[in-house]
């Protein structure tokens, strides 16, 4: 499990080669300037876009120090797999669509409006938001409800830093994340597969948990467009669709907010959506998972050996958030 202290390694004990494959470690402080991935990026093939992405030096703010409390002995998923096997329906429903089409997204300039039941509402420019707290690198597991998983080094800071800054009112019980929905930049928004814009939410105590990361980068680089640039949240004990991408609004509310997949299919996607091997999705068993990149065949993990899925994705320190709850009913 990832959470048990005796299963973790301290950062000083982990060779860089174990955290990042060597050929990728050499690229860790590189990125593509946002302007280079403007409208012209849509014409790039996925391999060309990846090469362009590694072309420029990373900004100073991205030199995040690895947090040894969030290291793991598990091997991270290769960068190429992380950036080409994605669910991001704003760019299409195939796993390859985000890498192929997300070049149209313009992550700069960018603003995030924090509003609702807070004493200090504010619209943050991306640069100001990134300076709010020290960046750190955390290696988290990501588990998709479709039965596949990855291990990814993310860069960001705890969402709780932002929450404390805006001073929630006592009546604020939930947080809603609203993603960009711009047909000019996101061709998938024209599809009726979901009600746009994409929306997700957390209970306030969930959002304040130190595991929740407001995320700006991965693998030592700025977030690629297809991975939710320029800012997203990572909630590692929940299925991946709970970790909203390309966020433009964060709302503090007193009632459980509507969430996109729950609206689309409430019998399949609950509000909580905690990783739970005992509660199957109607179309996918949740008892096991395939680790992307382990089949070595380039088939998206289709032939990777199955491994047992852990309750809360292995992050059992969140169990106290759900004391007394029937997690089959509140799935």
Curated annotation (Swiss-Prot):
Q: Please tell me where Mo-molybdopterin binds in this chain.
A: 86, 89-90, 144, 179, 227, 232, 243-245
GO MF terms here are: metal ion binding; molybdopterin cofactor binding; oxidoreductase activity, acting on a sulfur group of donors, quinone or similar compound as acceptor
- At the top of the EC hierarchy, this enzyme's class is oxidoreductase
UniProt GO cellular component terms: periplasmic space
Output the PTM entry: Predicted to be exported by the Tat system. The position of the signal peptide cleavage has not been experimentally proven.
In the record's cofactor note, how is the cofactor described as bound? Binds 1 Mo-molybdopterin (Mo-MPT) cofactor per subunit.
Annotated InterPro entries: MsrP, OxRdtase_Mopterin-bd_dom, OxRdtase_Mopterin-bd_sf, TAT_signal
Coiled-coil boundaries: none
CDD domains under this entry?
Answer: YedY_like_Moco
Q: Cross-referenced Gene3D superfamilies, in alphabetical order? A: Oxidoreductase, molybdopterin-binding domain
Does the keyword Metal-binding belong to this entry?
Answer: yes
Q: Name one GO biological process term.
A: protein repair
* Cystine bridges: none
Functional summary from the UniProt entry: Part of the MsrPQ system that repairs oxidized periplasmic proteins containing methionine sulfoxide residues (Met-O), using respiratory chain electrons. Thus protects these proteins from oxidative-stress damage caused by reactive species of oxygen and chlorine generated by the host defense mechanisms. MsrPQ is essential for the maintenance of envelope integrity under bleach stress, rescuing a wide series of structurally unrelated periplasmic proteins from methionine oxidation.
* NCBIfam families to which the protein is assigned, alphabetical: PRK05363.1 (NF003767)
State the name under which the record lists this protein. Answer: Protein-methionine-sulfoxide reductase catalytic subunit MsrP
Q: Which organism is it from?
A: Ralstonia nicotianae (strain ATCC BAA-1114 / GMI1000)
């Amino acid at each position: 499990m990832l959470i048990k202290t005796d299963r973790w390694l301290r950062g000083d004990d982990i060779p860089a080669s174990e955290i990042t494959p060597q050929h990728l470690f050499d690229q860790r402080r590189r990125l593509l300037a946002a302007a280079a991935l403007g409208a012209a990026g849509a014409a790039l093939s996925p391999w060309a876009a990846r090469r362009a992405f590694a072309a420029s030096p990373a900004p100073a703010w991205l030199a995040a120090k690895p947090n040894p409390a969030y290291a793991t002995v598990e091997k991270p998923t290769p960068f190429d797999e992380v950036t080409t096997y994605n669910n991001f329906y704003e760019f299409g429903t195939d796993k390859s669509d985000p890498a192929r089409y997300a070049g149209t997204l313009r992550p700069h300039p960018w603003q995030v409006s924090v509003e609702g039941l807070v004493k200090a509402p504010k619209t943050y420019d991306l640069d100001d938001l990134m300076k709010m707290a020290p960046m750190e690198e955390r290696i988290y597991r990501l588990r998709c409800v479709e039965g596949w998983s990855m291990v990814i080094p993310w860069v960001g800071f705890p969402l709780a830093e932002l929450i404390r800054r805006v001073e929630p009112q006592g009546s604020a019980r939930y947080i809603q994340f609203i993603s960009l929905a711009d047909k000019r930049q996101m061709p998938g928004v024209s599809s009726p597969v979901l009600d746009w814009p994409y929306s997700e939410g957390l209970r306030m105590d969930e959002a304040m948990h130190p595991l929740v990361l407001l995320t700006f980068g991965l693998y030592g680089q700025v977030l690629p467009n297809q991975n939710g640039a320029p800012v997203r949240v990572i909630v590692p004990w929940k299925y991946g669709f709970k970790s909203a991408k390309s966020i433009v609004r964060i709302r503090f509310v007193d009632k459980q907010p509507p969430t996109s997949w729950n609206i689309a299919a409430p019998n399949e996607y609950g509000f909580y959506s905690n990783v739970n091997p005992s509660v199957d999705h109607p179309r996918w068993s949740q008892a096991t998972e395939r680790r992307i990149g382990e089949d070595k065949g380039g088939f998206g993990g289709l032939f990777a050996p199955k491994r047992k899925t852990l309750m809360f994705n292995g992050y059992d320190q969140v169990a106290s958030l759900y004391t007394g709850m029937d997690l089959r009913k509140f799935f």
